[in-house]
C-alpha cells in the first residue's frame, strides 16, 4: 500500500493543480540505531509533513500519510478518500518496541527526547515597522558578513565595538546628547538604581528616548560599578541600536588609545626540523607564505603576517523563508514523545476510535477503593470547584490564563481535568498534553504525584523528560511533564500529536520560557485547534493577556483566578527576629579592621563601601525602635548573608520542640555549602541522629534532589535551597521558612567580555512565593532576613533573563527551528532585547562559521545548536573530536558548565590544599586539574561501589554532587556527538592523562582552550596580579591552582602567558579557571592581529612581543586555514574521520608538536606601576615554589621534582619544567630580561652548558652555567637577583642561585 498512499497524494496534487511533492530523506542514529527521517514539502503549502522508519521507503510513506492528514484538517480532503493504512503498507517493524502492552498502555521505554533529532516552521516581519527606515533586502546580511570579516582581520582587540560602528562607552553619551540637541528633543533622563549584592555594588541605569525617524521609543539599559559607568553603558546601548537602525552613522571621531604597558619580550626558538615540517605542510595545502622584509618593519609601521586565504568554506544555503513550528493533533500511527511513526502491529494500524476504547477499558480496570480515596482527596483541593470552568474555557479558547494562588492544586490537577474530559467523551486518544516546568525537580515530582493520584506508575498515563533522565508515557491519552528546555528541543520535530501545551510558572521569565511564548503565539495564530494554557500564582495578567490578545482572530485571553488552600503563615522581618530572639550579632569585620589593621590584601570577594547609610536599610530604621535593636540591626550588612542569625533562628526552633521541617532559601551553591558545613560542625545541628541537612540546587542529580521529599523519623529535616523550591513542588512537612530574600543572577557585559554573577535582592513576587512554602499543609512561620523597609523597596517582578544574557545560543535555536530572522523573531518577545545585542550575536556566530553569509545555519551551526553548552566551547569540542582529543575536550567542556568541585577542607580556608593541588601535577592549569579530577572520579565510579566514589571525594575534599552532574553532562556531550552529530564512535574513546609528565593530549587541550576563550588571555606580573590583553589589571582567583599557598610566595610559571575561562567582577576583577600557555599557542590559536615589528620580532595584538624567526611565525599562522578546512570537512562529513588521510594525520601531529610545553618561555621582569619592587625581588629567604604539605613524589616521567629547588638566598629561581634538558635542540641561548632590569637570566645551549653572555643585567656583566643540573646532563642556570659578578656549577641534581654576582 506504500505505493498507493504516495500515488494517491501525487494524483490528488495533479488534479488540483498543485506542485509536485518533494521528499527529503536523511539517515539519523538514535541510541546506536539507524532510522530514516523524511520531510515532505509541497509548493503552495506552509506545512512540512514528517515521517520516519527503519527504511527510506516506509519513512516516505509515513510522510505522505502525514500530509494527507494535514489536508483533511484543512478541509481540502475527506478522511474517507485516503487509502487505509494496513500492515502491508509498511515493510519494517519498529525498533522502538511500540507493542500493544508496552507502549500503548504502559508507555514507551525510557529514553530522552532531548536527544532526538527534530524539525521546521512559518513567520512574519520585524516590529520596528517603519519601512522607510528598514534596511533594504539583503543589506542586513551583507552588513553582518562585512563585520564578521573585519573581526577576522581586526585592527583592535576591542572586537565588539567594530560590530557596532565603533560606538563605545567613551564616545556614545556625547554623541547621543548632540543628536537630541540637533533633533530638538529633550535630553536623556537616566534612571539609576542600585542592584544590591553581597559581593559587588552594581548600578543599573535605564533610559528611554523617542526617535521620530521610526516613530517609536528606544529603551537602553546599562550596568556598571558606579553611576558614571552605568550611564555611559546605557547611552552606548541606545546609540548602538540607532546605528543598526540606520539612524546614526558609524563613529568617525578620534579613537582614544589606552596606554599600553611595555611587556618584556618572550623569546622562542623553534627547531629547524619542526619549522621545516610546518612550512612544507602549509605549502602542500596550497598556501603561499608571504615574503617578509624584516628590516623595514617597525613598531610604528608593522607588516601583517595574517592571511585571508580560505582553503575550505561551508556551503552557502539559500535564504530560508520564515515558517512556523509544525503541529498536528494526536494522529494514527504517531508517537509524539518519540517524534516517531509507530510501525509495529497492532497499534500502528488501530484507528483513533479503537485506541480510545482500549484506553477506557484500562481506566475501568483501575477503579477501586484506594483510587476512590485519592479522588476524594483531590476533590477537596480549591481548584476542584473550578473544574468545569477550566475545561469549558480551554475548549472554547486558543489561550487560557490561570492565576491560582499557592496551594490551590493547579500544577497537579489542570492537566488531569482536561484528560478526564476527553476520557468521559470516549475520545481519550485525541488528548496528549505537554506540561512545562522551570526545573527538573518540579517536572519529576509532579509526574510522580499525578501518576500516584491516577493509581499508576510513572510511564503509563504520566511521564517526564528532563536533562539526563526521562520516563516516556504511552503515545495516546497521556501527560508529559518536562523542562522548558526539553520542550524547545521537541519543537525541532514540530509538536505533532500534542493537543494541549501547558506552561506553568510563566512569571519566572527565564529566556527559554520567553522564547516558547513567542513560538506559541505564532502557532496559535496558524493552528486553530491547538490549545495553550498559561499558569502562575503570581503573574502580571495585563502583560500576558495583551501579548496574546493582539493576535488577529484570537480574541481576548480569558483569565481564571483561583484562591488557594494555604494555612496561615506568620511572617517576621529582620527587626522582628532580632527583637524576639534578643540576638546581638557580632561586630562586623569592617569595624574590627578599623581597630586592628587593614583588610587582607588578597580579599577579592567583598565589596568596599557597601555599608554607607544611603544604601543600608538596616541602618535606616524607625525612630521609635530602641537603641539596642538599632545597634543589632546596624551590625548586619545588607551585602552579607547573616549566617549567625540563621543559626539563632534554628536554635530557637530546636528549643521549642515543635516538629516540622525547615526550608532555608539562599542565593547560590557557595552559600548553600557554607551553611551546610556550618550546621554539620554545629554542636546541636551536627548530631546526625537528630537532624538531616539536605542541600537543594538545580544542578544536583535527580536522586539527590528527591531526598528532600523523604521523611526521616525522629529527625528534623533542614533543607538549604536556592529558589528551586520556590514554586511547583510541595515538601509536605515544611513548617518553617528562613528566607535570605536574595537571588543569584548571571549578567554579561559584551563590550568588555565581563561576566558578573550578582547576588541581588529577590522581587516581592519571589518573597511571597517563598513565604507560601511554609503554609502548604499546616500553619507555618516565615523569617525574612531583610527589614520591612527593604521589603517595601523590592521590585514587584524580576528582570527578564533575555535582557541580560548573550543571545548566541538562542539565535542558533531560532535558526535551527527555521523561525526566520533572529531580530524579527525576538522583536515579538514580551520584552524584546536591544537590537544591538541581536546584531552582535549574528556577527559573532558568523565569524565562528556557524552562520553563512545569508545568516543561515552551516553544518557546524546545526551541530552547535544541538549542544547544551556555549557555542564557542562547542566549536572547539567538535574540532577537538576531529583532532582525536574528543574525550578530553568533553571532560573540560562539561566541567566548565558547573561550579568547581573543590571544597575547602575547613571553612576558614581561602585557598586550595596541597592534596587538591595534586590534580594539576606540574601543569600549572586549573583546566588540567579538573580533567584529572573527572578521570579520577570516573575510575572510582567504575569500581561499582558507591563507597569508592565517596571515599575519593572525601579524601580530596571534592563535591560528589558536582562531579555527578559533570559526569552526566560529559556522557550527554558524547551522546550528542555520536547520535546527533554522527561522529564515529571509535574516535570518542577515553584518554588517560598524565599530569606529572609529558602529555600531548593535555597540551592540545590547552591550545583549543585558547581558541575558545580568546581574548581571555593575561600576562602574569607577580603574586596574583595579571594584565589582561586589553591592558587592564586583574587578579587570579583565590581558588586557582596558580595561586601560591600563602601571600609570601611568588609563583614561578614556565611562561608568563595565561588563558582563563571568564572575568568576574566582585570587589575587583578576578580571572577564573586559568592555565599557563606558551606564546606559540597564543600565536597560532588565539591572536587576532600578528605583525612583524622588526628583525626577529613578532607582535601579537599590539601587546605581546615575541622574539623568534619571522618566517617560522608566518608558517605557523598559515596553519589556521588548514585547521579551519579540517573543521569544515569534519562537519560536512563526520564519517570521514573514521579513516584519516595522511594530510589530516600530519596536521594532528603538527598541532600536538607545536603545543608542547617545550615552547614555554619565561619573559623578563615588568617595570610597570602595577608591580612593585617587592613583588619583583623578594627580600631575604624565599620559599619553595609551592609548599605542598602532602604532595608526595613526582611522576617518574618528569625531570622536575619540588625538592630540586632549595630556598633561595635572594632573587628568584625560574627553573624550566618538564623534559627541558641542556642537550635538547629546543634549548637555545636566549636572554629573558632587558638591560638594567635588576634580574639575571638563564642560558642554554645544545651541549648542555650555558654560554657566556656579555650583556648588562643591572651591574652584572656575565654568568657561566655548569653541567650536572638535576643530573640531567646540563641545562641549568643561575639567576642574579641584583647584578654583580658570580658563577658556579650545578651540583649532583641540584641547582642554586646567586644573589650577589
Curated annotation (Swiss-Prot):
Residues 4-73, 171-244 form the DRBM domain. One of its GO terms (biological process) is mRNA processing. Residues 840-931 are annotated as: HA2. Residues 601-611 have a biased composition (Acidic residues). A motif (DEAH box) lies at residues 504-507. Residues 6-10, 55-57, 226-228 are annotated as: siRNA-binding. Its main location: nucleus. Residues 971-1089 are annotated as: OB-fold. Residues 584-621, 1190-1239, 1275-1301 are annotated as: Disordered. PANTHER family: ATP-DEPENDENT RNA HELICASE, ATP-DEPENDENT RNA HELICASE A. This is ATP-dependent RNA helicase A. The gene is rha-1.
Amino acid at each position: 500500500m506504500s505505493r498507493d498512499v504516495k500515488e494517491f497524494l501525487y494524483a490528488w496534487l495533479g488534479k488540483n493543480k498543485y506542485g509536485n511533492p518533494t521528499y527529503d530523506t536523511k539517515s539519523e542514529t538514535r541510541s546506536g540505531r539507524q532510522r530514516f527521517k523524511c520531510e515532505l514539502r509541497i509548493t503552495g503549502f506552509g506545512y512540512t509533513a514528517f515521517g520516519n522508519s527503519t527504511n527510506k521507503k516506509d519513512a516516505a510513506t509515513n510522510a505522505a500519510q502525514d500530509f494527507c492528514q494535514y489536508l483533511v484538517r484543512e478541509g481540502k480532503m475527506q478522511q474517507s478518500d485516503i487509502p487505509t493504512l494496513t500492515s502491508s503498507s509498511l515493510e519494517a517493524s519498529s525498533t522502538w518496541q511500540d507493542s500493544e502492552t508496552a507502549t500503548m498502555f504502559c508507555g514507551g521505554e525510557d529514553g530522552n527526547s532531548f536527544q532526538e533529532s527534530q524539525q521546521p516552521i512559518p513567520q512574519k516581519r520585524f516590529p520596528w515597522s517603519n519601512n522607510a527606515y528598514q534596511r533594504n533586502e539583503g543589506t542586513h546580511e551583507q552588513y553582518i558578513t562585512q563585520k564578521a570579516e573585519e573581526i577576522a582581520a581586526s585592527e583592535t582587540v576591542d572586537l565588539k565595538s567594530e560590530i557596532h560602528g565603533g560606538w563605545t562607552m567613551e564616545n556614545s553619551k556625547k554623541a547621543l546628547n548632540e543628536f537630541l540637541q540637533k533633533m530638538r528633543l529633550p535630553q536623556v533622563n537616566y534612571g539609576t538604581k542600585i542592584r544590591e549584592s553581597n559581593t559587588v555594588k552594581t548600578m543599573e541605569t535605564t533610559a528611554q528616548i523617542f526617535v521620530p525617524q521610526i516613530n517609536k521609543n528606544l529603551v537602553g539599559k546599562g550596568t556598571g560599578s558606579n553611576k558614571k559607568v552605568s550611564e555611559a553603558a546605557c547611552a552606548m546601548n541606545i546609540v548602538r541600536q540607532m546605528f543598526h537602525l540606520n539612524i546614526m552613522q558609524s563613529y568617525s571621531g578620534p579613537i582614544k588609545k589606552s596606554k599600553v604597558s611595555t611587556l618584556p619580550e618572550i623569546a622562542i626558538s623553534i627547531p629547524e626540523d619542526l619549522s621545516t615540517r610546518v612550512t612544507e605542510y602549509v605549502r602542500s595545502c596550497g598556501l603561499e607564505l608571504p615574503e617578509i622584509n624584516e628590516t623595514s618593519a617597525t613598531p610604528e609601521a608593522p607588516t601583517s603576517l595574517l592571511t585571508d586565504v580560505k582553503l575550505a568554506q561551508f556551503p552557502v544555503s539559500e535564504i530560508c523563508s520564515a515558517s512556523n513550528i509544525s503541529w498536528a493533533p494526536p494522529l494514527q500511527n504517531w508517537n509524539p514523545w518519540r517524534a516517531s511513526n509507530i510501525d509495529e502491529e497492532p497499534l500502528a494500524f488501530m484507528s483513533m476510535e479503537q485506541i480510545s476504547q482500549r484506553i477506557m477499558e484500562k481506566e475501568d480496570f483501575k477503579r477501586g477503593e484506594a483510587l476512590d480515596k485519592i479522588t476524594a482527596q483531590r476533590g477537596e483541593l480549591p481548584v476542584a470547584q473550578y473544574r468545569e470552568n477550566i475545561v469549558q474555557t480551554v475548549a472554547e479558547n486558543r489561550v487560557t490564563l490561570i492565576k491560582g494562588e499557592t496551594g490551590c492544586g493547579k500544577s497537579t490537577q489542570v492537566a488531569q481535568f482536561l484528560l478526564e474530559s476527553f476520557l468521559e467523551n470516549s475520545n481519550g486518544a485525541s488528548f496528549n498534553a505537554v506540561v512545562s516546568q522551570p526545573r527538573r525537580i518540579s517536572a519529576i515530582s509532579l509526574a510522580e504525584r499525578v501518576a500516584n493520584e491516577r493509581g499508576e506508575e510513572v510511564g503509563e498515563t504520566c511521564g517526564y523528560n528532563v536533562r539526563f533522565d526521562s520516563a516516556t508515557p504511552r503515545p495516546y491519552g497521556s501527560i508529559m511533564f518536562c523542562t522548558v528546555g526539553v520542550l524547545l528541543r521537541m519543537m525541532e520535530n514540530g509538536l505533532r500529536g500534542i493537543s494541549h501545551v501547558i506552561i506553568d510558572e510563566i512569571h519566572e521569565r527565564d529566556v527559554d520560557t520567553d522564547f516558547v511564548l513567542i513560538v506559541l503565539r505564532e502557532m496559535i495564530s496558524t493552528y486553530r485547534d491547538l490549545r495553550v494554557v498559561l499558569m502562575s500564582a503570581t503573574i502580571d495578567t495585563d502583560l500576558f493577556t495583551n501579548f496574546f490578545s493582539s493576535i488577529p482572530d484570537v480574541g481576548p485571553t480569558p483569565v481564571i483566578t483561583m484562591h488557594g488552600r494555604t494555612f496561615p503563615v506568620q511572617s517576621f522581618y529582620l527587626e522582628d527576629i532580632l527583637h524576639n530572639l534578643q540576638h546581638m550579632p557580632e561586630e562586623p569585620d569592617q569595624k574590627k579592621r578599623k581597630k586592628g589593621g587593614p583588610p587582607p590584601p588578597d580579599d577579592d570577594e567583598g565589596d568596599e563601601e557597601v555599608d554607607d547609610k544611603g544604601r543600608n536599610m538596616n541602618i535606616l530604621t524607625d525612630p521609635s525602635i530602641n537603641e539596642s535593636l538599632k545597634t543589632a540591626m546596624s551590625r548586619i550588612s545588607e551585602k552579607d548573608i547573616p549566617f549567625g542569625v540563621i543559626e539563632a533562628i534554628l536554635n530557637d526552633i530546636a528549643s521549642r520542640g515543635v516538629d516540622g521541617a525547615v526550608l532555608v532559601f539562599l542565593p547560590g551553591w557557595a552559600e548553600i555549602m557554607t551553611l551546610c558545613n556550618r550546621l554539620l560542625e554545629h554542636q546541636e545541628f551536627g548530631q546526625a541522629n537528630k537532624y538531616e541537612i539536605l542541600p537543594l540546587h538545580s544542578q544536583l542529580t535527580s536522586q539527590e534532589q528527591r531526598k528532600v521529599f523523604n521523611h526521616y523519623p525522629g529527625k528534623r529535616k533542614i533543607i538549604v535551597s536556592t529558589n528551586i523550591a520556590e514554586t511547583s513542588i510541595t515538601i509536605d512537612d515544611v513548617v518553617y521558612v528562613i528566607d535570605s530574600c536574595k537571588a543569584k543572577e548571571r549578567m554579561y557585559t559584551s563590550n568588555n567580555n565581563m561576566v558578573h554573577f550578582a547576588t541581588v535582592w529577590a522581587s516581592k513576587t519571589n518573597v511571597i512565593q517563598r513565604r507560601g512554602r511554609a503554609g502548604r499543609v499546616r500553619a507555618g512561620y516565615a523569617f525574612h532576613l531583610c527589614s520591612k523597609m527593604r521589603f517595601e523597596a523590592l521590585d514587584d517582578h524580576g528582570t527578564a533573563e533575555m535582557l541580560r544574557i548573550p543571545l548566541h545560543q538562542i539565535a542558533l535555536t531560532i535558526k535551527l527551528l527555521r523561525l526566520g530572522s533572529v531580530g524579527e523573531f525576538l522583536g515579538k518577545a514580551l520584552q524584546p532585547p536591544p537590537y544591538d545585542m541581536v546584531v552582535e550575536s549574528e556577527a559573532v556566530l558568523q565569524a565562528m562559521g556557524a552562520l553563512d553569509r545569508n545568516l543561515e545555519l552551516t553544518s557546524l551551526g546545526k551541530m552547535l545548536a544541538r549542544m547544551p553548552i556555549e557555542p564557542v566551547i562547542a566549536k572547539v569540542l567538535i574540532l577537538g573530536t576531529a583532532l582525536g582529543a574528543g574525550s578530553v575536550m568533553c571532560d573540560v567542556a562539561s566541567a566548565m558548565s558547573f561550579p568547581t568541585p573543590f571544597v575547602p577542607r575547613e571553612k576558614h580556608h581561602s585557598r586550595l590544599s596541597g592534596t587538591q593541588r595534586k590534580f594539576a601535577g606540574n601543569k600549572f592549569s586549573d583546566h588540567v586539574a579538573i580533567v584529572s579530577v573527572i578521570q579520577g572520579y570516573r575510575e572510582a565510579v567504575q569500581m561499582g561501589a558507591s563507597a569508592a566514589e565517596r571515599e575519593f571525594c572525601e579524601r580530596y575534599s571534592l563535591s560528589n554532587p558536582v562531579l555527578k552532574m559533570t559526569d552526566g553532562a560529559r556522557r550527554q556531550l558524547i551522546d550528542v556527538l555520536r547520535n546527533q552529530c554522527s561522529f564515529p564512535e571509535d574516535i570518542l574513546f577515553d584518554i588517560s592523562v598524565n599530569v606529572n609528565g609529558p602529555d600531548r593530549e593535555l597540551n592540545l587541550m590547552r591550545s583549543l582552550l585558547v581558541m575558545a576563550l580568546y581574548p581571555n588571555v593575561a600576562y602574569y606580573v607577580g603574586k596574583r596580579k595579571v594584565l589582561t590583553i586589553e591592558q587592564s589589571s586583574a587578579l587570579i582567583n583565590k581558588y586557582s591552582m596558580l595561586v601560591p599557598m600563602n601571600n609570601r610566595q611568588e609563583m614561578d610559571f614556565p611562561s608568563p602567558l595565561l588563558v582563563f575561562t571568564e572575568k568576574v567582577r566582585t570587589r575587583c576583577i578576578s580571572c577564573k579557571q586559568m592555565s599557563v600557555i606558551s606564546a606559540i599557542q597564543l600565536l597560532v590559536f588565539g591572536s587576532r592581529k600578528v605583525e612583524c615589528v622588526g628583525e626577529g620580532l613578532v607582535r601579537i595584538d599590539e601587546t605581546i612581543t615575541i622574539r623568534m624567526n619571522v618566517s617560522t611565525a608566518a608558517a605557523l599562522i598559515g596553519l589556521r586555514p588548514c585547521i579551519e578546512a579540517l573543521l569544515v570537512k569534519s562537519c560536512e562529513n563526520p564519517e570521514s574521520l573514521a579513516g584519516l588521510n595522511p594530510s589530516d594525520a600530519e596536521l594532528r601531529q603538527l598541532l600536538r608538536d607545536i603545543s608542547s610545553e617545550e615552547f614555554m618561555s619565561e619573559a623578563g621582569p615588568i617595570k610597570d606601576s602595577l608591580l612593585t619592587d617587592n613583588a619583583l625581588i623578594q627580600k631575604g629567604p624565599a620559599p619553595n615554589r609551592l609548599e605542598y604539605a602532602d604532595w608526595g613524589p613526582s611522576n617518574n616521567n618528569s625531570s622536575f621534582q619540588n625538592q630540586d629547588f632549595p630556598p633561595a638566598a635572594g632573587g628568584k629561581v625560574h627553573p624550566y619544567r618538564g623534559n627541558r634538558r641542556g642537550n635538547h635542540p629546543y634549548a637555545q641561548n636566549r636572554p629573558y630580561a632587558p638591560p638594567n632590569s635588576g634580574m639575571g637570566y638563564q642560558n642554554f645551549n645544545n651541549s648542555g652548558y650555558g654560554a657566556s653572555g656579555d650583556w648588562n643585567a643591572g651591574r652584572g656583566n656575565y654568568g657561566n652555567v655548569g653541567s650536572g643540573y638535576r643530573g640531567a646532563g646540563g641545562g641549568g642556570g643561575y639567576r642574579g637577583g641584583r647584578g654583580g659578578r658570580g658563577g658556579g656549577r650545578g651540583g649532583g641534581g641540584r641547582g642554586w642561585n646567586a644573589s650577589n654576582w
